[in-house]
């Protein structure tokens, strides 16, 4: 499966912003990182809610089909986890954004797919 990713320069910028958020908890850093990803994929920014823990501490993030993302805040991530590294948290954010990118706007994507499948099929008419 071929996957379209942002250019390396944009990915590095997003990674730096997520790293800065993990260290300083500035909400603007996180919002800029998510906005950059969403801008590349032409999606609305997801609604992100922060939690101390999710699913009794077994889950670090959760994405719903309506575009809502639940994440463990870095402040809480550092406290109560066995694997509490910055890299692991950033990886979790990317994982949940992957869910968001592939689930987002399913109806619209299905409609576009359907229309492109039939485009040119009845060319003789």
What residues fall within each predicted segment?
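A short, surface-exposed helix-loop junction/capping segment
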Residues: 8-22
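Zn2+-dependent metallopeptidase catalytic core
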Residues: 25-45
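Active-site scaffold of zinc-dependent metalloenzymes
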Residues: 49-87, 100
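A short, highly charged nucleic-acid-interacting micro-segment common to nuclease
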Residues: 19-29, 107
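Post-HExxH zinc-binding segment in Zn-dependent metallohydrolases
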Residues: 104-125
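Long, well-structured alpha-helical subdomains associated
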Residues: 6-9, 123-125
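Active-site recognition of the HExxH zinc-binding catalytic motif
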Residues: 91-103, 111
């Amino acid at each position: 499966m071929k996957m379209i990713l942002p250019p390396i320069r944009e990915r590095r910028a997003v990674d730096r912003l997520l790293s800065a958020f993990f260290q300083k908890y500035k909400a603007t850093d996180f919002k800029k990182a998510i906005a950059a990803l969403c801008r590349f994929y032409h999606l609305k920014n997801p609604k992100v809610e922060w939690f101390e823990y999710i699913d009794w501490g077994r889950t670090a993030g959760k994405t719903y089909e309506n575009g809502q993302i639940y994440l463990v805040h870095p402040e809480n991530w550092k406290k109560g986890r066995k694997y509490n590294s910055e890299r692991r948290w950033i990886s979790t954010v990317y994982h949940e954004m992957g869910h968001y990118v592939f689930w987002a706007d399913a109806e619209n994507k299905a409609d576009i797919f359907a229309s492109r499948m039939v485009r040119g099929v009845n060319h003789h008419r």
